[in-house]
Amino acid sequence: MNMLLEINDLNSYDIEFIFDTAIQHFNNSNVSNNSLYGKTIVNLFFESSTRTLSSFEISAKSLGARTVTINVSTSSMNKGESIIDTVLNINAMNPDLIIIRSQYSQFIKEISKYLPNCHIINAGDGHHEHPTQALIDYCTIRYIKGKIHNLNISICGDILHSRVARSNIRLLSRYGANISIVAPPTLICNLKGVSHIHHNFVEGISDSDVIMLLRLQKERMTNFTISSEEEYAYLYMLNSENLSYARSDVIVMHPGPTNKGVEISHYVAEKKSIILLQVKMGVAVRKAILEYLLCHN
């Protein structure tokens, strides 16, 4: 395997290797090695990112790789160069791996057909997939709970526009999780692997082992999908009161960025969630993914 474009690119062996390696890195987060010494990794992000871009940079550099991050706002795209030509020109410089984020669903899969000999990671494409975030969430849940099978996992928020939801549902359902999606009717779509659909928030999180919250992706909303953020928060924000309906050992997750006071209260985000642990796990998981693609294939 030389590309990670969708979560279904990974078989059980791949995922087990990534999990085991990630946990080693997580438990030894202050230890650097040179497993990627001499490798050049290009970050090509056509869409805004804080956590994902920083996480990949830190992961690559801590493994000894050289990283090149392209500032798209000052690239030749401003002179009329197409996205495809930009990627092809970067590839012609023979990097060992290109990490791409795009606002266009399926774009990275399409461009990969022109780059058969290049290692590529999909760092998020439109509302299609975000496979590395799903692996981070899988590893985080398994690290804390010890398993995925038979866990009640509620994914709440803007399901319709969420690449994180799609990748997580595909991965977690494969390992036997009972997945509920919780959202207003206008932010729901039919996805294979979902056990239950709820429009009532309390019903959707009742008896949950894991609550995964998603922000409203207003930048992708083209139609009238919610009346207001205030009404959405009133009906769908996780707070200390409705959190009591979940299991006592529930873990609260969020892939970021969070909009506190909309999908999650300040108190729950800061006192009851494992959001920062997810971020720490993100570096460990991305180290494992980079090593798997560049050292074990």
Curated annotation (Swiss-Prot):
It catalyses: carbamoyl phosphate + L-aspartate = N-carbamoyl-L-aspartate + phosphate + H(+). Carbamoyl phosphate binds at residues 51-52, 101, 130, 133, 256-257. InterPro entries: Asp/Orn_carbamoyltranf_P-bd, Asp/Orn_carbamoylTrfase, Asp/Orn_carbamoylTrfase_sf, Asp_carbamoyltransf, Asp_carbamoyltransf_Asp/Orn-bd. It holds the Pfam family OTCace. GO terms for cellular component: cytosol. Pathway: Pyrimidine metabolism; UMP biosynthesis via de novo pathway; (S)-dihydroorotate from bicarbonate: step 2/3. Keywords: Pyrimidine biosynthesis, Transferase. One of its GO terms (molecular function) is aspartate carbamoyltransferase activity. Disulfide bonds: none annotated. Its EC number is 2.1.3.2. Belongs to the aspartate/ornithine carbamoyltransferase superfamily. ATCase family. Heterododecamer (2C3:3R2) of six catalytic PyrB chains organized as two trimers (C3), and six regulatory PyrI chains organized as three dimers (R2). Catalyzes the condensation of carbamoyl phosphate and aspartate to form carbamoyl aspartate and inorganic phosphate, the committed step in the de novo pyrimidine nucleotide biosynthesis pathway. This is Aspartate carbamoyltransferase catalytic subunit.
